[in-house]
């Protein structure tokens, strides 16, 4: 749920850092970062610092940073918690497209609409499994 963006770096630099850490060259890191930032609807905010972004924009940049290296497994805790309905839809559509590209996405959400789109659903109550839907 925490965004943990680096305050001294722009949005695109925050995303690039993850790509550079994966040993991508700077040009590829920047291209891939910009592609992801565009997919989350923030191309026009790419050169802004976290202090200049709203909470929802920071969340979308943090998601961009998490997926820029195309991880096989994505763990997301309330990935749309700070987002309005339109942006939440955009993020979940992006995550579900990634799922369809042989990736595993595990997410926690209080949003029943998005929870019901999952292939498998586990409901918790007071820290204990309440129901399990789907094959596990």
State where each predicted segment sits.
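Helix N-cap at the start of a conserved alpha-helix in ABC-type nucleotide-binding domains
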Residues: 85-87
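Hydrophobic anchor residue at the start of the ABC signature
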Residues: 63
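Conserved ABC ATPase signature
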Residues: 49-53, 57-58
């Amino acid at each position: 749920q925490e965004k943990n963006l680096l305050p001294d770096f722009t949005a695109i630099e925050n995303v690039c850092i993850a790509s550079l850490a994966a040993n991508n060259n700077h040009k590829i890191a920047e291209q891939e970062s910009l592609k992801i930032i565009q997919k989350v609807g923030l191309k026009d905010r790419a050169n802004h610092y976290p202090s200049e972004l709203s909470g929802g924009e920071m969340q979308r940049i943090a998601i961009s940073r998490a997926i820029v290296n195309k991880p096989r497994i994505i763990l997301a805790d309330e990935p749309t918690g700070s987002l309005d309905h339109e942006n939440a839809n955009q993020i979940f559509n992006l995550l579900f497209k990634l799922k369809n590209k042989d990736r595993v996405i595990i997410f926690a959400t209080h949003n029943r609409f998005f929870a019901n789109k999952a292939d498998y659903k586990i409901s918790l109550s007071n820290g204990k499994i309440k129901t399990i839907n789907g094959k596990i």
